[in-house]
Design a protein with these regions (language model features):
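Conserved DxG motif in ATP/Mg2+-binding regions
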Residues: 145-150, 221
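Acidic-enriched, low-complexity/disordered segments with a strong bias for Aspartate over Glutamate
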Residues: 14-20, 65, 70-72, 85, ...
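Active-site helix-to-loop segments that bind/position phosphate- or nucleotide-bearing substrates
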Residues: 1-134, 140, 148, 153-169, ...
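Conserved C-terminal helix/linker of AAA+ ATPases
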Residues: 51-52, 134-143, 207-220
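Flexible, glycine-/charge-rich segments associated with ATP-binding catalytic modules
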Residues: 37, 57, 157-159, 165-256, ...
Length: 305
């Protein structure tokens, strides 16, 4: 109820007067008082999972070391409303320090924006193809988080979602998505993925990577600077559009550009070099003024790590 009140503050007084049946109906967790699959996924007890067979209400967190070896794991089940918090607390959100020119005092940021972690997990829950009977995976590596869910990416293109910045016309699990929206778990207004990109931009980190092959969605969030010139460019050029940054992100990741993308970046003198070995222009990534970020990142672990 607290989440629902936060989402709909104008109904706060009425919410306190609703009995449980009324509240669950209003939150779209039940339908005319009857239990739905969405209610079992989000609020059900762990032993209730068999009612939605062959679906699995499971999120697996897996920790890997720098060599790719498994170090630890945890599997959380129903209720997924609470499982998200349990998985989130497992992830080690280390501190990054960056040093500005003209000062000896470092500034610290979290390696990952909390919103990005939660949005990625909740998107997996909302868009998982539960008919395939698979788990949602959260894989934690030294400098990356990987989130996977089964099922195709219905909008077709991540760039399309970001560019349109509007609600999707169709969802795989419409009733579940509505319930999660009402509980403030996801943003069905179409801005969640875009916000993830913007948070990475603010850190000067690589943008989220989406792999839509093999009938699944795999999202990789990188928690470090990959290319110093990319970081310098973002720090110095606040006027760059998100579309331009997405293209520069492809350059730093050595991903191929099509002819239109190449021409666009060359015309604006954002890249140099010859195909396929493009790199970010030295001019746009030139040294920064004192007030801007010096691209010197130091990863540090917390005292309790």
């Amino acid at each position: 109820r607290t989440n629902y009140k936060s989402k709909f503050p104008n109904q706060a007084v009425d919410i306190d007067l609703w009995d449980d049946v009324t509240f669950l109906n209003k939150a779209k967790l039940t339908f005319k008082g009857k239990i739905t699959r969405a209610a079992i996924l989000l609020l059900g007890r762990e032993e209730s999972e068999h009612f939605i067979n062959p679906a699995q209400a499971k999120i697996r967190w897996l920790l890997k070391d720098s060599a790719g070896n498994d170090k630890d794991y945890r599997i959380e089940g129903c209720p997924l409303l609470l499982a998200v918090d349990k998985i989130y607390t497992r992830i080690r959100n280390l501190k990054y320090r960056y040093i500005k020119d003209g000062t000896l005092f470092p500034e610290e940021i979290d390696q990952y924006e909390p919103f990005v972690i939660r949005e990625a997990i909740n998107n997996c829950i909302a868009h998982q193809d539960y008919t395939k009977g698979g788990r949602i995976n959260v894989i934690e590596m030294e400098d990356q988080l990987v989130f996977t869910n089964l099922g195709s990416f219905i909008p077709g293109s991540v760039e399309k979602v970001i560019r349109e910045n509007a609600p999707e016309e169709r969802y795989r699990n419409q009733f579940l998505a509505n319930a999660m929206f009402n509980l403030k778990m996801v943003d069905t207004a179409g801005g969640g993925i875009r916000k993830m990109f913007l948070y990475q931009r603010e850190r000067f980190f690589p943008l989220p990577d989406y792999d839509l092959s093999e009938d699944r969605v795999k999202v990789t969030i990188t928690g470090k600077v990959l290319d110093i010139d990319f970081a310098r460019t973002l720090a110095r050029n606040k006027e760059l559009t998100l579309d331009e940054i997405i293209l520069l992100d492809k350059v730093q990741k050595k991903k191929p550009l099509n002819e239109a993308e190449e021409k666009y970046l060359k015309d604006r003198k954002l890249i140099e070099g010859r195909k396929p070995n493009y790199y970010i222009s030295a001019g746009i990534a030139a040294s920064l003024p004192d007030s801007a970020m010096k691209a010197h990142y130091i990863k540090t672990r917390g005292f309790d790590d």
